[in-house]
Amino acid sequence: MQADKLSIRTGVAVVAALFTATLTVDAVAQAGRATAKRAEQKPAAAQKAAIPPLGPLPPVPVPADNPMSPEKVELGKMLFFDSRLGGDASSPCVVCHQPGKGWGDGDEISRGYPGTQHWRNSQTVLNSAYYNKLFWEGSVTSLEGQAPAAAEGNVAGNGDPSLMEMRLRFIPEYVAAFRKVFGIEQPRMTQAYQAIAAFQRTLVSDAKQVPFDRYAMGDGKALNESQMRGMQLYNGKAGCILCHNGPLASDQKFHALGVPDNEAFKTSPLAQITHRWQQYQKGVPEANYRDAPLDRGLYYVTKNPKDIGKFRTPSLRELKYTAPYMHTGVFYTLEEVVDFYDRGGGDTPNKSPLVKPLALSAQEKKDLAAFLEALSMDKPLLMDAPPLPAYQPLRR
């Protein structure tokens, strides 16, 4: 055991060795014969490709056309919690992204707008500021684009922008806030979405609370022995680093894994109806959308058959608080997720060549799950709902 500790050492020097920006699967594998043997079995392209290192998150990127300010963030927070930004004033952002449930909703699949039933798991908005593509299929490229897609999406908020805008104009506190923050006379939805995006950029992991980040910054005692072994597996035999890399622990690419369908596909008429209707809305040929139960993922964006079943790699940060997992919400524990990958994923036509059986031992599975938990903060990011202003009639 002492030899193992000396081989990996501690602190920044270890991170530099294990997670250098030019790190390749071959370089990671040199830590031991077993790991090297596993690396030789990886696809040649993967062996040659440079892998971005895991590490603490950098400063949040802020677009030049939507600078941050405390007042804008506070306005965005209010709007995030306000149910009036939705069709029937019952579906605010926070319904599907609850602070007490890891900023997801804790359900296998999202509830959907009243009268519909979603068919995908509601992803956490924690650290969403770092994504260059959002939603499971990557259909938008910024938080400013994500907010209207959710508020106006017909299975999410289903809000009409002109109606939502008028609601805001009948709330004097919002009128005053929009004037102060944006310099406009009346609330406009474009600026409302900018404020929500600014608020979401504050929902990020605190490196001081994340064991792995503390380790990467020099605290050699931040990870226990099981987590240290799990880190070696992550970067070697298990190959997690191939897709879950960089500070976000996501390559932000799209892969087909063969994740099992949720039972709602088989048992919920409303889910089946909504899914088929959405396939029609997304331009799936009529010959297919009426009968196809499969969630086609990236295909809805590209219409390329080779993209059927591919979904964006989610971040592995804050996994302790964001169960259930996968786009269908079928796994409730990290152990189940590790077992799925250990089996080599599931069956799907466009399956990623990176997903293969791992032959992990029971102890290795425990160690890997332990390291995955070390990518989460010690305590969840909780937040109380702010007081929301009431409507006021216009004076005549």
Residue spans of the language-model regions?
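Periplasmic c-type cytochrome electron-transfer domains
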Residues: 4-7, 11-13, 22-396
